[in-house]
Amino acid sequence: VTAHSTTRLLSSSYDGPLYRVVRDSDGAYLDVTADSRGYAFSELQDEFCRDAVCRISIIYDQSGKGNDLTQAAPGTFNGPAKGNFNELPIADMAPVMLNGRKVYGVYIMPGMGFRCNNAKDLAINDEAEGIYYVIDGTHYDSGCCFDYGNSSTNGRAVGTGTMETTYYGTSTAWGRGNGEGPWIMSDMEAGLFTGYDAKLNDV
């Protein structure tokens, strides 16, 4: 359904940009592409954003379906940005090395977020799907909810069991895993699941 990455190509058939950065000072933007090895051409961003604050405004979908992630619009919960949108992440806050090459991940703080409310070919109801992502295991909080996956398509909490996303953090409102966390849990709307039920899973 989607393939999002700011660090590298995920599909050999994709030849578009990985993500877009926008400068706070003048609103100018730049699409960051991949180099010949498939890694993000971070030098483009560094030059464009020199002496300026840049934010990631689009994470392009590499699946070919056009399910790009953009600034999350207001829904059940309003964001802190203009128009009650979510904030956009600062573009250089998550540098990481990939095979000796500096690239940038996405550093999400409370109030930041992306969405795609018109995604194509989503899994519906109990249709099968898989979710795979790479995160910084040291970056998390206890709030609800830092998710990635197949969420509702209108930004609203529309009912129990209407999402299929993955959560990473130490929230214990619905359940928890073994030890002090953080834990990977499934956020299906109105509940974080560590196993079959929303409760302690000490496996």
Give short role names for the model-derived ranges:
Residues 56, 64-202:
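Extracellular glycan-recognition modules
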Residues 1-83, 125-128, 132-134:
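GGW-centered surface loops in extracellular recognition modules
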